[in-house]
Amino acid sequence: MRTTTRRAPRVGIGGPVGSGKTMLCLKLCQRLRERLSMAVVTNDIYCSEDAQFLIRQSALPAARIAGVETGGCPHTAIRDDTTMNEQACRALEATFPELDLLLVESGGDNLTATFSPELVDAFIYVIDVAEGDKIPRKGGPAIRFSDLLIINKVDLAPLVGADLEVMARDATAQRGGRPFLLCDLKREHNLDAVIGWLEREVLFARTAAPVG
């Protein structure tokens, strides 16, 4: 009898280089791993540094963390040709059929980066205030259409002259009612709100137990 592997709920995490994508993966794993079965797929162009970071930090057991070396443009691997990421996700789902949540971290990319809906069920886009308070105003598909926008590293705003009120106003204008959060992920400021969003918008979709 043929059996099929249950697809785990998948959440994409995108954003520019250094914005805090891997930190978000780490913090979510640390906070949720005791009550959820989790795995992570990371993307880098020429290495697996983000996967190795998560392994060194003991975010999850190493077998639950897979690093994809895309060898090219990051958004191609999450939107245009998702084959490598899909294979990595399916391998983890086959090994851990009880998965409650699978995170897919993109390589660092620009404001046009979005995830294919065939690869993930929802996606979070992470920017940081050190990039300048004009970033939300620039718009682009990632700013406008991500399911959740995180404006990270709010603790740095006074040091770089970024106006958080301006960033919040512009994010509101760009996103048409879609949620955004001001966070300091390293210190877990507003991490509870991110987890609350995951619980409401993604984890409710947890499917039945695997077959076979």
From Swiss-Prot:
<dbReference type="Pfam" id="PF02492">
    <property type="entry name" value="cobW"/>
</dbReference>
<keyword id="KW-0143">Chaperone</keyword>
<dbReference type="InterPro" id="IPR003495">
    <property type="entry name" value="CobW/HypB/UreG_nucleotide-bd"/>
</dbReference>
<feature type="binding site">
    <location>
        <begin position="15"/>
        <end position="22"/>
    </location>
    <ligand>
        <name>GTP</name>
    </ligand>
</feature>
<dbReference type="GO" id="GO:0005737">
    <property type="term" value="C:cytoplasm"/>
</dbReference>
<keyword id="KW-0996">Nickel insertion</keyword>
<protein>
    <recommendedName>
        <fullName>Urease accessory protein UreG</fullName>
    </recommendedName>
</protein>
<dbReference type="InterPro" id="IPR004400">
    <property type="entry name" value="UreG"/>
</dbReference>
<dbReference type="GO" id="GO:0005525">
    <property type="term" value="F:GTP binding"/>
</dbReference>
<dbReference type="GO" id="GO:0043419">
    <property type="term" value="P:urea catabolic process"/>
</dbReference>
<comment type="function">
    <text>Facilitates the functional incorporation of the urease nickel metallocenter. This process requires GTP hydrolysis, probably effectuated by UreG.</text>
</comment>
<dbReference type="GO" id="GO:0003924">
    <property type="term" value="F:GTPase activity"/>
</dbReference>
<comment type="similarity">
    <text>Belongs to the SIMIBI class G3E GTPase family. UreG subfamily.</text>
</comment>
<dbReference type="GO" id="GO:0016151">
    <property type="term" value="F:nickel cation binding"/>
</dbReference>
<keyword id="KW-0963">Cytoplasm</keyword>
<keyword id="KW-0342">GTP-binding</keyword>
<dbReference type="InterPro" id="IPR027417">
    <property type="entry name" value="P-loop_NTPase"/>
</dbReference>
<comment type="subunit">
    <text>Homodimer. UreD, UreF and UreG form a complex that acts as a GTP-hydrolysis-dependent molecular chaperone, activating the urease apoprotein by helping to assemble the nickel containing metallocenter of UreC. The UreE protein probably delivers the nickel.</text>
</comment>
<keyword id="KW-0547">Nucleotide-binding</keyword>
